[in-house]
């Protein structure tokens, strides 16, 4: 069982649940990356003693770190209409960041594809397992950032 499946609806006790502090989405995405064994913690992206750095626990900080560190690259960003075709280039392990009012307010991890190749995501906050990446984000002002992770 993968990290995202095992800890989607029951949180991993090795990590703090950051929902009371504003959200757990970036913490969960960081756990998935770290538990994959392909990424080591560092001084900027780190979790220790029940606390995490901004890059580990904050959606905006997480997205900025992934892109600025070279651990990921932007596939595209924009409205749903501007990004849905490119979304078919997402692969399990990649991320979607959701921008509202000029700020990244949520991130989710691509964890599968439906029968037509449409990306499915898993995330915390509104806990979801294998749902379409755009589900619940129909507000026309939302901008999506599709991010390829370099594993």
Task: Give names to the regions the model predicted.
Residues 1-57:
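N-terminal capping segments
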Residues 36-38, 91-95, 142:
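Loop/turn elements at helix/coil->beta-strand transitions in domains of secreted/extracellular proteins
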Residues 49-120:
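...with weaker cross-activation on analogous glycine-rich loops/strands in unrelated enzymes
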Residues 23-32, 107-111, 122-123:
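Active-site scaffold segments
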Residues 42-45, 107, 133:
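Short, solvent-exposed loop/turn and secondary-structure capping segments
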Residues 120-128, 133-151:
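Low-complexity, Gly/Ser/Thr/Pro-rich intrinsically disordered linker/tail segments
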């Amino acid at each position: 069982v993968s990290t995202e499946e095992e800890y989607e609806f029951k949180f991993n006790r090795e990590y703090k649940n950051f929902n009371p502090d504003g959200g757990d989405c970036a913490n969960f995405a960081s756990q998935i990356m770290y538990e994959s064994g392909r990424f080591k913690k560092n001084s900027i992206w780190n979790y220790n003693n029940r606390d995490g750095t901004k890059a580990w626990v904050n959606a905006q900080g997480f997205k900025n770190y992934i892109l600025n560190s070279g651990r990921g690259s932007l596939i595209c960003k924009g409205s749903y209409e501007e990004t849905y075709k490119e979304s078919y280039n997402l692969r399990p392990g990649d991320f979607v960041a959701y921008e509202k009012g000029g700020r990244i307010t949520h991130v989710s991890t691509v964890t599968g594809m439906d029968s037509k190749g449409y990306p499915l995501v898993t995330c915390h906050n509104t806990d979801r397992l294998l749902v379409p990446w755009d589900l619940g984000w129909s507000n026309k002002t939302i901008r999506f950032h599709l991010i390829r992770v370099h594993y």
